Structures are given as structure tokens and as C-alpha cells.
Amino acid sequence: MRVHITMECTECHERSYLSNKNKRNNPDRLELKKYCPRERKVTLHRETK
């Protein structure tokens, strides 16, 4: 089952990315390096509820 998730920047805490994931394949929270427009650099983004 695919679920909608929001990605939050770990440095500025801005929620700038929406995505979806398969909970069966990825039961834990996703952590991806993405571009943060507020910081203007690539930072670690974590999944939020």
C-alpha cells in the first residue's frame, strides 16, 4: 500500500517535498539528501507524518 509522505529539512525544518512510499518495502522513515530552497544547498530531509 502506497502512502503520501512529507519530507522535512533537518536544518531549517521547512517541509518542501511531497512524495509517496510503499510501507511494506520501507517500514521505517525515509532519509534522503535533497535541495533545500531556504538554505540554498543540499541537506538531509526526513519523512514526517
Curated annotation (Swiss-Prot):
Sorted alphabetically, which keywords does the UniProt record give?
Answer: Ribonucleoprotein, Ribosomal protein
GO BP annotations, alphabetical order: translation
Name the PROSITE patterns on file: RIBOSOMAL_L33
Question: What domain of life does the UniProt record list for this protein's source?
Answer: Bacteria
Any one GO CC term of the record: ribosome
Keyword Cell cycle on entry? no
Molecular-function GO terms, alphabetical = structural constituent of ribosome
Tagged with keyword Ribonucleoprotein: yes
Family designation: Belongs to the bacterial ribosomal protein bL33 family.
Q: Which HAMAP family match?
A: Ribosomal_bL33 (MF_00294)
The family database entries (NCBIfam families) matched by this protein are listed as: PRK00504.1, PRK00595.1, rpmG_bact
**The protein's name in its UniProt record:** Large ribosomal subunit protein bL33A
Species this chain originates from: Latilactobacillus sakei subsp. sakei (strain 23K) (Lactobacillus sakei subsp. sakei)
- Tell me the name of the encoding gene: rpmG1
